[in-house]
């Protein structure tokens, strides 16, 4: 078949005759617009999950992945620290896409807290980053004898009663604290982390 005998669309280049061009253009525009909207909106949920805790966030147990139920202050018992992630109560988005958002909730007697700690506590509960400041392992082992948190990787030890100060091991700085307040009987984030969470490098 010579070129003159070929019908529109038969040349293999994807061209069409003029009668159908407008219809195809409209469909392409619709598909492109829909794809663009999906791309634009998709990161919003991911961003919310990666964002650091925000004032007004509530907390959910760290093993919950959807349909979060807010942790109540009464659920955090003395000597039994609880791992948690913050979540946005409006969108129900759990901020668990970054492990740097994981916190450990520790219940103490009011008489154990100094003035500075009381300002960041709610019902005797303090929140610390659960991520060691050395190499970003989890500092979650509770030592009741001296009320400290220990990282299982390199034995860095943090004093809960002294704003997470390093008392042993290679960690270069204190555990960040996350100030709390109460909303009814639920624990709520009062302010951002006191310092950025994460390891030294």
Stretches with model-predicted labels:
Residues 23-28, 39-57:
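N-terminal twin-arginine translocation
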Residues 158-199:
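Short Fe-S-cluster ligation motifs
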Residues 5-9, 126, 131, 145-147:
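Processing junctions and N-termini across compartments
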Residues 1-24:
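N-terminal secretory signal peptides
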Residues 49-131, 136-141, 182-201:
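N-terminal pre-ligand scaffold of iron-sulfur
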Residues 133-140, 144-156, 161-174:
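Acidic, glycine-rich flexible loop segments
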């Amino acid at each position: 078949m010579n070129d003159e005998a070929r019908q529109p669309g038969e040349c293999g280049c994807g061209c069409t005759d003029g009668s159908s061009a407008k219809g195809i253009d409209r469909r392409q525009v619709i598909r492109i617009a829909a794809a663009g909207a999906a791309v634009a909106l998709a990161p919003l949920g991911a961003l919310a999950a990666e964002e650091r805790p925000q004032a007004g966030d509530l907390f959910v147990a760290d093993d919950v992945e959807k349909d979060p139920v807010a942790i109540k202050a009464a659920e955090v018992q003395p000597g039994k620290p609880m791992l948690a992630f913050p979540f946005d109560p409006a969108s129900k988005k759990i901020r668990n896409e970054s492990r740097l958002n994981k916190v450990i909730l520790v219940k103490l007697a009011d008489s154990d807290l100094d003035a500075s700690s009381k300002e960041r506590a709610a019902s005797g509960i303090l929140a610390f980053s659960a991520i060691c400041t050395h190499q970003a392992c989890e500092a979650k082992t509770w030592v009741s004898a001296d009320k400290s948190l220990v990282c299982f990787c390199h034995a860095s030890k943090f004093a809960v009663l002294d704003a997470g100060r390093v008392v042993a091991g290679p960690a270069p700085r204190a555990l960040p604290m996350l100030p709390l307040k109460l909303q009814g009987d639920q624990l709520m984030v009062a302010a951002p982390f006191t310092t950025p969470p994460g390891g030294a490098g």
